[in-house]
Amino acid sequence: MTTKHHLDTVSAAGLLVAMGIIYGDIGTSPLYTLRSIIDTHLVEPNLVKGALASVFWTLTLQTSVKYVILILRADNRGEGGIFALYALIRRHARWLTLPAIIGGSALLADGVITPPVSVSSAIEGLTLVYPQIPTVPIVIAILTGLFLIQAFGTSVVGTAFGPIMLVWFSMLAILGIAQISLNPAVVDALNPYYAYWLLTQYPGGFWLLGSVFLCTTGAEALYSDMGHCGRANIRVSWIFVKICLVLNYFGQGAWLLSIQGQRLGERIPFYELMPDWFLPTGIGIATLATIIASQALITGSFTLISEAIRLNFWPKVQLRYPSLQKGQLYVSSINWLLWAGCIGVVLYFKESKNMEAAYGLAITLTMLMTTLLMAYYLYSKKYNSWGVVLFLGVYLALEGAFLVANLIKFPHGGWVSVLIGLLIGGVMVIWLQAFQIKLRLAEYVRLDQYIGAIKELSRDISIPKYATHLVFMSNAGRQSEIESKVIYSIFQKRPKRADIYWFVHVDTTDDPYTMEYKVNTLAPDDAYKVTFRLGFRVEQRINLFFRKVIEDMVRNKEVDITSRYESLSRQNVIGDFRFVVLEKFLSFENELPVYERLIMNVYFFIKGFTPSESRWFGLDSSSVKIEKVPLVIRSVENIQLKRLTS
């Protein structure tokens, strides 16, 4: 992974990558946004112009101003996204954890809704050519195929994403221009007065904001994927993308003005812009665009989970890297949970217009939480206080209005995304609280008090040698400390004699790509403590990293790793390395409060479905000893036990 990101360098390749990765979601919104706003209403000029004005100014205020101009300033060494932003400021205030968890879980919930909505909207265009064709099986087949290829990496097809999306946006613009030329009066809708009229004068107009919001649901991706493309490439490419989107929306508006006095019925404004001869091609391009949008969201979900793990928000599930390309991450458990969720959404709602009711509510919460975190970031960076208050006030009001308007969707399907978000958020809260409980209850001792005993044990030939090099994974952050459980394992559980003892600690930093280590020599050629400082986006391949540390130390003549058996030493045979990983369980002898006991029981239940710590750290299973140790809180006190004499 690179350690320096050229955020402000613009290149043709970068612009194309941005087109393919970032704008899939927001770029496919024209498929369903205006149809959702108009819905069953009678088409009339002020409704159409009000809808267009609302879309235009939402894109301007929400996407252009908030995300492209303001939020992209908050980069964590080139990386963006709600967890990257949280990592920048989490040490300043503990309460920031709550908005980070709400925003992250809502964003993951959105990953279950967006692919079905996007793909269904594209495939339903086939009904214009083949009215009797069943769309649900086709949508399920496409989504299943998409999730199946994740395990093999998407670097090959990924190279085509940019050009395909360039074709898509060009098509949006051309179709829009052709229709606008037939009804230029639609340009009046640039006037924000029409948006004001829609919200205040049109019956139930305020509640239409829930559908208007669909035009900007992909805005969060601009920030989340900043590390892939760079800030400058996003800002420059957005100019082109926004022009294409606005032209298409206004083209649809021009067509709607041509049918004023009617209702939409089964007609889809997006496809009505296409001449009949182009319809099959247009549907094909739309399908490819929605697949790309879904792919970007899946990849984003994998990245989000990997960050959540390192921030102690999520269980340590297995992560795989199918290719060396940056961003190519695969999380099997999340992949198939997303697949099951997407298929469930398709089977439950069947049509995209039904799915739209479940869409938007979750992502509104994410945007609100990003606003809170960003305001605190600006405050911590000593920006003008009035400017911070203005930013917070404007966007809390705007996004609060969108949230309230989206709440009307709750009984019609919005509950689905809320339920998914609550489940994900619940896991995050439980995992974080369990981590904090374990941290509070962990007992540490000073290493220097045991170095003499460790050296004596190492030379006690009456005890069988356990390993030449014995490596303990430790949670003790201080160089001078170690868990009491490690000392217990060395001396009491079964005395473990070794030539050299190693204590390895991994410290996850708020900087995404830190890769550093420090060695503390406790006793030359007897005991060492190695501390790795790894960024929250770095794969924790401790087996590989530890080998590198040993090589460096041998080269610098800091340690001799040759076996100390005389016959092997003469042959310069390297001694064996054995890792010990301590896995805790909740002992019955504890006095935890009921709430904390419940948290820990749920924590250990979930942990039973996750890989062991040794697999997470990439340790060779043949050289790992996993020891179960009780999470003993304190000895049970005041037991009245009477001894009987016979």
Residue ranges and their predicted role:
Residues 1-646:
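The structured alpha-helical core of multi-pass membrane proteins
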